[in-house]
Swiss-Prot record:
Any matching Pfam family: ADK
Function of the protein: Catalyzes the reversible transfer of the terminal phosphate group between ATP and AMP. Plays an important role in cellular energy homeostasis and in adenine nucleotide metabolism.
Subunit details: Monomer.
Region spans: NMP: 30-59
Keyword Oxidoreductase assigned: no
Name of the protein: Adenylate kinase
Binding-site residues, AMP: 31, 36, 57-59, 85-88, 92, 160, 171
E.C. number(s) listed in UniProt: 2.7.4.3
Ligand binding (Zn(2+)): 130, 133, 150, 153
Protein keywords: ATP-binding, Cytoplasm, Kinase, Metal-binding, Nucleotide biosynthesis, Nucleotide-binding, Transferase, Zinc
Amino acid sequence: MNIVLMGLPGAGKGTQADRIVEKYGTPHISTGDMFRAAIQEGTELGVKAKSFMDQGALVPDEVTIGIVRERLSKSDCDNGFLLDGFPRTVPQAEALDQLLADMGRKIEHVLNIQVEKEELIARLTGRRICKVCGTSYHLLFNPPQVEGKCDKDGGELYQRADDNPDTVTNRLEVNMNQTAPLLAFYDSKEVLVNINGQKDIKDVFKDLDVILQGNGQ
């Protein structure tokens, strides 16, 4: 099965991707992993991508698509794949459709994990880190035994600048604006399935699993 996994930051994509991989053995392919592998292998496209990344510039779509093509052509993807972080735009989605068509394949499911904005903000702003040892906590999911203190060494816990509510809210709004056209594109293709990501982790996976087994709409 050929899957695209979508969801805003904090929606739990990584957790659910791990569960899909564990059950189905489908390779989890993220944009970052693809770039790192291509660069490490020293492929022509990897060298090109590195030149843009070293300058702090966006990697052009044609290079990104080429790297995706190389990755999806590997034998571990013969029975399917789980794409995470790609495509990000409608032109990328159209290019992905074309390259898959050239391979006699197509996207079967686009799974979009939906979580309310307020819940995402709570999830993303709850992280706290020890100033002494760097241990990470979460006020909702993994709180310290003593508020504001590290369990290991009693060090002061702090919130990273990019975890503050204003920064998180802005990041979410940017992501929402970017993904809206892509969601509409896949909805028009009748492959988009919205999943309620506010449930317990196990229940979210149950809903995903129903779709992957072909028993859901």
